[in-house]
Amino acid sequence: MSHRVLGTERISPREEHVLTPNVTAILVAAGRGTRAGGGLAKQWRPLGARRVIDWTLAAFDRATQVSELLVVLHPEDMDLAATLTAAKPLRCVSGGATRSASVACALAAVADPEAIVLIHDAARPVVSADLIARVVAGVIETGAAAPALPVVDALWTGAGDRVTGMQPRDGLYRAQTPQGFHAGAIRDAHAAATGAAADDVEIARAAGMPVAIVAGDEQNFKITYPQDFARAAALLKERDKMDIRTGNGYDVHRFGTGDAVILCGVEVPHDRALMGHSDADVGMHAVTDAIYGALGDGDIGQHFPPSDPQWKGAASEIFLRHAVALAAERGYTITHMDCTLVCERPKIGPYHAVMKAKMSELMGLQPDQVSVKATTSERLGFTGREEGIAALATVTLVRT
């Protein structure tokens, strides 16, 4: 691996909005490891309410960056393919005699050479949404990326039961998966590989590909020994606890010269326009802030500073899409949104249905999960004096 570490930083929200690569998650589940004990291969063994492979599959199924799922099975396990389920497109292929051969079988099934592939051990069921997002961002930025943790313990060499020396730990990392590449590049690297390889990073580097390190996760360990099942089950039970969050958002914009206002993504004719650094969509801003609030992650001003000229006149749906994607990356599903617009004029009623449809589309929600309504302030305050429009929003998030 190269020694550049791409910690937890993200690509910019504008880049995130524009870049929507096709991402295939390849889950390697063709092994026959015996160290974990039991009669079944470890990926098929129960882990709480699900099997190991089901937990792993669900993690990538929830990841917003992932487009499809490709599972590599042992030839004798192909009859179990029908027991695997996912919301996203799911395919299963038969693996080979070694891990590398199994990965090569999966890569042969990915048609787009520019697609990003995330190659992951099915026996790492506690992989997080944040880690998946970091690897995808690393591939977008550098072409290849993999998670790892720096070695922090002292390292010895030994013979039998005696210490024979010390090993410097500077520059040493514990490798994890998913390891991300462009499909065509890593497929060519596998085709050129000779001999055994510890993982796909070794194969990539042998082909001359630089690989960036992204920050790994201590919980993303590989089930290897019998005691690992209890540890993984405890972590997944804790993660699976019901976590419901509510966020509130409030925004206001004053009137200025113009002939229309934009509210909840819909242009409404009016004798004035709302003033703001972006398109001044007060409704969408309130909803976006409500999502950030539920995540405990600041507000629009922190993610899209008004001092940054790139957001001058920007469409507010960029901000909302960013907040929705951020919630999904952190493992949350938005289950409901309620937005109230406060103004004397323009009248919102004729545009209510199209506003609701627009917000449903942008947030990936059903119509009955979205409410957009309007009220007046009975001629009181700045909205009553028709100096501007205010909006309040409440959003509910559930960890999935």
Swiss-Prot record:
Reaction(s) catalysed by this chain, per the record, are:
2-C-methyl-D-erythritol 4-phosphate + CTP + H(+) = 4-CDP-2-C-methyl-D-erythritol + diphosphate; 4-CDP-2-C-methyl-D-erythritol 2-phosphate = 2-C-methyl-D-erythritol 2,4-cyclic diphosphate + CMP
Q: Where is this site: Transition state stabilizer?
A: 35, 42, 277, 376
Molecular function via GO:
2-C-methyl-D-erythritol 2,4-cyclodiphosphate synthase activity; 2-C-methyl-D-erythritol 4-phosphate cytidylyltransferase activity; metal ion binding
Q: Where is this region: 2-C-methyl-D-erythritol 4-phosphate cytidylyltransferase?
A: 1-244
Name the residues that bind a divalent metal cation.
251, 253, 285
Cofactor(s) needed by this chain: a divalent metal cation
Region 2-C-methyl-D-erythritol 2,4-cyclodiphosphate synthase, as annotated, extends over 245-400
Which CDD domains does the entry link to? CDP-ME_synthetase, MECDP_synthase
Positions bound to 4-CDP-2-C-methyl-D-erythritol 2-phosphate: 251-253, 277-278, 299-301, 375-378, 382, 385
Q: Which UniProt keywords apply?
A: Isoprene biosynthesis, Lyase, Metal-binding, Multifunctional enzyme, Nucleotidyltransferase, Transferase
Q: Which Gene3D superfamilies match?
A: 2-C-methyl-D-erythritol 2,4-cyclodiphosphate synthase, Spore Coat Polysaccharide Biosynthesis Protein SpsA, Chain A
Task: Give the pathway listed in the UniProt entry for this protein.
Answer: Isoprenoid biosynthesis; isopentenyl diphosphate biosynthesis via DXP pathway; isopentenyl diphosphate from 1-deoxy-D-xylulose 5-phosphate: step 2/6; Isoprenoid biosynthesis; isopentenyl diphosphate biosynthesis via DXP pathway; isopentenyl diphosphate from 1-deoxy-D-xylulose 5-phosphate: step 4/6
InterPro entries from the UniProt entry: IspD, IspD/F, IspD/TarI, ISPD_synthase_CS, MECDP_synthase, MECDP_synthase_CS, MECDP_synthase_sf, Nucleotide-diphossugar_trans
Q: Which GO terms describe its biological process?
A: isopentenyl diphosphate biosynthetic process, methylerythritol 4-phosphate pathway; terpenoid biosynthetic process
Q: Where is this site: Positions MEP for the nucleophilic attack?
A: 169, 222
Give the EC number(s) under which this enzyme is classified: 2.7.7.60, 4.6.1.12
| Known function | Bifunctional enzyme that catalyzes the formation of 4-diphosphocytidyl-2-C-methyl-D-erythritol from CTP and 2-C-methyl-D-erythritol 4-phosphate (MEP) (IspD), and catalyzes the conversion of 4-diphosphocytidyl-2-C-methyl-D-erythritol 2-phosphate (CDP-ME2P) to 2-C-methyl-D-erythritol 2,4-cyclodiphosphate (ME-CPP) with a corresponding release of cytidine 5-monophosphate (CMP) (IspF).
Similarity field: In the N-terminal section; belongs to the IspD/TarI cytidylyltransferase family. IspD subfamily.
Name this protein carries in UniProt: Bifunctional enzyme IspD/IspF
User: Which organism does this record belong to?
Assistant: Dinoroseobacter shibae (strain DSM 16493 / NCIMB 14021 / DFL 12)
